[in-house]
């Protein structure tokens, strides 16, 4: 008989709904300043005193859109951006042509509160407490967002990794360059030349003016080569070609640049770049990068 009774108690317990209101933790400086971690499945307890206001603070940048309660006659709410101010208030009842004022009374003013912001939904139990010096009440309940903070930290770390990859210098694959210096042209001669199979890199130190670069075709005709200055190394001129022969010109000065290990196939830039683990993605106008 005892076993049957015990089994029945267990079944009743398992079948009963689980109510576990989350109680904010008080600050070590003042217990009336309270903090609670956000969880969309929690109902948070807010304890107030008659005649004393309180506020609920949501995430910075979050904006309150809607506030609802089961006892709006007995509570006053005022929303301002991410802060909700609340206070128990008196209510007036009419009976037999008489008006009766009822002051907030602990135990009779308890209700629920629902807040919707532009980012989340919140649920609360509002409880009016007795005792003017009750230390369990809240002057402020402030939410913390550990999951959002962790996600932001991961995103920031990923961004740093991507930025580091973007800032990585391409790996040189060919240093075998020679040059022919024209008369009085030494001032535009590069001190370093290499390529990564896709672009050619020339160094011009000491704040020298960069010459224009021209591609020399088999018939000796010349065509200008697009170029840019390396943002991370302002003394490097990046030519958007790898060629067997190029010419540098600045006024009457001329330098011949010869690629002694020219590979017509170059490096197959399948990802659109020659930087490892960096892929070039072309998006349509207005399309967000993921």
Curated annotation (Swiss-Prot):
Entry keyword set: Signal, Virulence
CDD domains, sorted: VirB9_CagX_TrbG (cd06911)
Family annotation (InterPro entries): Conjugal_tfr_TrbG/VirB9/CagX, VirB9, VirB9/CagX/TrbG_C, VirB9/CagX/TrbG_C_sf
Residues spanning the signal sequence: 1-20
Source domain of life: Bacteria
One Pfam assignment: CagX
Family, similarity comment: Belongs to the TrbG/VirB9 family.
Protein's name in the database: Type IV secretion system protein virB9
């Amino acid at each position: 008989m005892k076993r049957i009774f015990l089994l029945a108690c267990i079944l009743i317990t398992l079948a009963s709904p689980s109510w576990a209101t989350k109680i904010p933790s008080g600050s070590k400086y003042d217990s009336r300043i309270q903090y609670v971690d956000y969880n969309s499945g929690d109902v948070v307890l807010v304890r107030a005193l008659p005649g004393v206001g309180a506020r609920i603070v949501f995430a910075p940048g979050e904006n309150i859109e809607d506030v609802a309660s089961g006892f709006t006659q007995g509570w006053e709410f005022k929303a301002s951006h991410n802060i909700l101010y609340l206070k128990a208030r008196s209510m007036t009842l009419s009976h037999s042509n008489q008006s009766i004022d009822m002051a907030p009374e602990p135990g009779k003013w308890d209700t629920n509160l629902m807040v919707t912001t532009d980012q989340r939904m919140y649920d609360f139990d509002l409880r009016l407490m007795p005792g003017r010096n009750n230390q369990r009440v809240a002057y402020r309940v402030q939410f913390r967002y550990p999951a959002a903070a962790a996600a932001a930290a991961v995103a920031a770390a990923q961004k740093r990794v991507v930025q580091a990859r973007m800032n990585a210098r391409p790996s040189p694959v060919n240093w075998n360059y020679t040059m022919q210096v024209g008369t009085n042209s030494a001032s535009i001669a590069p001190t370093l030349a290499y390529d990564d199979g896709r672009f050619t890199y020339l160094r011009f130190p000491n704040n020298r003016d960069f010459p224009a670069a021209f591609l020399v075709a088999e018939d000796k005709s010349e065509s200008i080569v697009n170029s840019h200055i390396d943002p991370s190394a302002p003394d490097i001129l990046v030519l958007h070609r790898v060629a067997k022969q190029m010419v540098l010109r600045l006024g009457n000065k001329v330098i011949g640049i010869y690629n002694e290990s020219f590979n017509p196939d170059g490096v197959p830039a399948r990802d659109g770049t020659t930087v490892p683990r960096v892929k070039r993605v072309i998006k349509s106008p207005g399309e967000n990068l993921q």
